[in-house]
Amino acid sequence: MSRPIRAFINCAALRHNLAVVRRHVHQARIMAVVKADAYGHGLLRVARALDAVDGFAVLELEAAIQLREAGFSQLILLLEGFFSIEEIEAINHYRLSTVIHCHEQLSMLLAHKKTGKPDIFLKINTGMNRLGFRPEEGNSVLNRLRQWHTDISITLMTHFACADDLLEADHVDQQLGSFARLEEKREGCIPRTLANSAAILRYPGTHADWVRPGIILYGASPLPDKTGIELGLQPVMTLTSRIIAVQHLDFSDRLGYGGQFVADQPMRVGVVAAGYADGYPRHAPTGTPVLVNGRRTRLIGRVSMDMLTVDLSGINEAGAGSLVTLWGEGLPVEEVARSAQTISYELLAALSPRVQTVSSIP
């Protein structure tokens, strides 16, 4: 029998969360961000549940090809673009869309033979300072692309650095201003994509032609002051395991690596088959919430590679075989992330391949 840790993926929740996005964006087209194996939820499983979207965004060419070969006909965008001439050929062959964010990519594309109708998302750096051309370069790059290929589709794209933070609204306005100045100088109407998950929720004026929801599709909040549940979302991943042993600590007994937890009274401890090699955060401290048989308790001691330990005080019926919920249904992943001083994105995307995923809920 295999280890009892499981990640249950609720595909109905995915569709519910997509409906929430649609209510926010009205007429904008939706490009579901399914990078990092759909944030740890399984690329094809998620894409099939979200097959009503207008497009998908991925990172690797291999993931884009996997989607296309699985029969998805929607737009499929490579968020970091291409890295070689050979990849441009594959993009053409599989009818993929690509970001262009730097002069090196532009030079590779312009040196490539003209085939088909290229679909380019031109990334503009409006203030995140990660990827993209400077706004003052935008029209020059647009003109070079149009001179290279008269039958080319171009969408302008940018990414917000601080849309999740209400105290940084001025920074969002500055980025919008940079984008608007580029638009004032160009000729004709070009589609735009600006809004990530946080902007979808907080800045309706950024929705434009395409929105790019990521974390909200998986039921977690992009906003630091709210959980997904508070936003009307449903958790898609519920990570569970089982207690595999029970230990009895006496007063002053120490627990686990480093002996950092010291019992201040006699207590029962559940040893759970889940550790940092499964994707649970090693730095989660004592006090991080967990559920045992649906009842709230706490992580105690240091998380090890394959196991962690939980406080069974007051849960007298718990023992070997009892169900432990690490996050998901009944325990928001944002709460666990906050305790571990990280973000829900990291916890979901870090799920280990050794954890079996099941398209259901426990």
From Swiss-Prot:
Binding residues annotated for substrate, in chain numbering: R130, M305
Catalysed conversion reaction: L-alanine = D-alanine
Cofactor(s), names only, from the UniProt record: pyridoxal 5'-phosphate
One Pfam family, short name: Ala_racemase_N
Alphabetically ordered keywords of this record: Isomerase, Pyridoxal phosphate
Enzyme class: isomerase
PROSITE patterns xrefs: ALANINE_RACEMASE
Gene Ontology biological process terms, A to Z: D-alanine biosynthetic process
Biological or metabolic pathway of the protein: Amino-acid biosynthesis; D-alanine biosynthesis; D-alanine from L-alanine: step 1/1
Keyword ATP-binding among record annotations: no
GO-annotated molecular function: alanine racemase activity; pyridoxal phosphate binding
N6-(pyridoxal phosphate)lysine PTM positions: K35
A cellular-component GO term for this protein: cytosol
SMART domains for the chain: Ala_racemase_C
Domain of life: Bacteria
Record-annotated membrane-spanning stretches: none
Active site positions: K35, Y257
The keyword Isomerase is annotated on this UniProt entry: yes
EC number, as in UniProt: 5.1.1.1
InterPro entries listed in its UniProt record: Ala_racemase, Ala_racemase/Decarboxylase_C, Ala_racemase_C, Ala_racemase_N, Ala_racemase_pyridoxalP-BS, PLP-binding_barrel
Similarity section: Belongs to the alanine racemase family.
Main function: Catalyzes the interconversion of L-alanine and D-alanine. May also act on other amino acids.
HAMAP family, A to Z: Ala_racemase (MF_01201)
UniProt protein name: Alanine racemase
Organism: Nitrosomonas europaea (strain ATCC 19718 / CIP 103999 / KCTC 2705 / NBRC 14298)
Phylogenetic classification of the source organism: Bacteria, Pseudomonadati, Pseudomonadota, Betaproteobacteria, Nitrosomonadales
Gene name tied to this protein: alr
